[in-house]
Structures are given as structure tokens and as C-alpha cells.
């Protein structure tokens, strides 16, 4: 899946979409449809806050999201992930919101995360960013 799409989008194997498609092709449909897909910064934010919102940075750099426009539904349908389009990209967190870098996530640290980190419950958590651009 290392190719250039009709609208100039280039997908590389280290990006999330090829990995998600690989999983879809190897998992039972009833299991795949229950998955939530996160890039690492968003997963860490989820673990800290319990919120499934995603960062614009992760979605743009790793998940073929276009800021201001969202995802290209035709692209997802063409590659076999049409269910993402029909579910408003719920498995990618879009139905919960897309945040810019540093924007507050949820109500801050959950009690569990706060206890594990030795911090106060509700300590603000900002939307993350990826660690490199490739």
C-alpha cells in the first residue's frame, strides 16, 4: 500500500491505515468492528483520561485525516474500509472529536491514572503530538 492516490495522498506502510486494513483482513468481522484504533500519543491520552478523542496531529500525520476537511470517504471505500465512512469514523475517534495540540482532554487525569502517576485526579492533560515526521 505504498502508493499515491488520485488526490495526491501517499500512504506508507508505517502509517495506521495500512495496519488497520491488515487487521481487518485477518480478524473476524465481529471482533474488528469492536476495535478502537489509536496512534501512541492518543492511546496514552486515552489511558490518562478515559477520553477517546484524537489529536489532529496523529490523525493528520498517521491516519490520512485532512484538517478542516476530515477524511476522504472515497479513499476509505476504495481500499475496503467503507464501514469507517458509514460509522462516521467512530473507530478512529472522530465521533468523539478531534483536538489540536495541547487542547485540554476530557476532565484531566482519571483517579486510576492519577494514583498510578502520583498526581492529583483532574490534573489537566493536553492533546498530544507525534514524536517525529517522516
Question: Predicted regions span which residues?
Answer:
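Glycine-rich phosphate-binding/catalytic subdomain of phosphoryl-transfer
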Residues: 1-134
